[in-house]
């Protein structure tokens, strides 16, 4: 609980301040997330995993400099480097190790970078909160709806406690929160959206669905590598 409160304070303050503070936080969390993902496969301290970290850092440098044209080159050369290491050191690494390294760059680093990208965009100080409205809103409503009405298992092999009713409640709740949030801040925005309320509702709906898919994907990876948790870098 203490760790959760501490992290919530850091996240909220970084979103409010934005700039380099949020950028460094996203980059740091990305590297930690990649480390834990690679750790599941046992490549977190090996050359293949280190290559993934280097590609992620290079990508974040492009993000900070605003050189979005170079991002594609970073991914292309990164993929070439990963495959070169895989081929030269064969059979040290399995093909799924190489794929996991490249997937981790996108699944963790690139996805998280969009929190910063959205924050520095027009009206980003308002729009960026939709990420948390949709994800946290979905988790909260899904939990209570599942406890009260959950009867049909959604993905019993991946997450036995998740129910179809909980998923529906989570997505519905997140969408409603998006509508409420849109009403609250619509008058403060610069007019980037013609209908901010409905735009936020759609964004929250999609965000909630992605939250569910992302959670199940993380569970699937854990099942594949037969681990209970990704790591314990953060107590609690």
What are these regions (language model features)?
Residues 223-236:
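Interfacial loop-to-transmembrane junctions
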């Amino acid at each position: 609980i203490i760790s959760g409160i501490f992290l919530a304070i850091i996240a909220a303050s970084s979103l409010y301040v934005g700039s380099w503070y949020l950028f460094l936080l996203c980059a740091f969390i990305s590297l930690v997330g990649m480390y834990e993902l690679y750790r599941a496969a046992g490549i977190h301290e090996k050359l293949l995993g280190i290559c993934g970290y280097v590609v992620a850092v290079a990508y974040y440098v492009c993000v900070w400099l605003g050189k979005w044209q170079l991002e594609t080159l970073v991914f292309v050369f990164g993929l070439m480097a990963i495959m070169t290491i895989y081929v030269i050191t064969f059979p040290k690494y399995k093909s799924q190790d190489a794929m996991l390294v490249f997937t981790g760059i996108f699944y963790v680093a690139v996805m998280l970078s969009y929190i910063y990208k959205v924050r520095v965009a027009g009206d980003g100080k308002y729009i960026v909160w939709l990420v948390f409205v949709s994800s946290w809103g979905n988790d909260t409503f899904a939990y209570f709806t599942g406890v009260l009405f959950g009867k049909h298992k959604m993905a019993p092999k991946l997450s036995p406690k998740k129910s179809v009713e909980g998923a529906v409640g989570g997505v519905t709740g997140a969408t409603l929160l998006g509508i409420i949030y849109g009403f609250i801040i619509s008058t403060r925005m610069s007019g980037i959206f013609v209908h901010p309320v409905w735009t936020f509702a759609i964004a929250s709906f999609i965000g909630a669905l992605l939250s569910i898919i992302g959670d199940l994907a993380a569970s699937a990876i854990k099942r594949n590598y037969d681990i209970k948790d990704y790591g314990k870098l953060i107590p609690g």
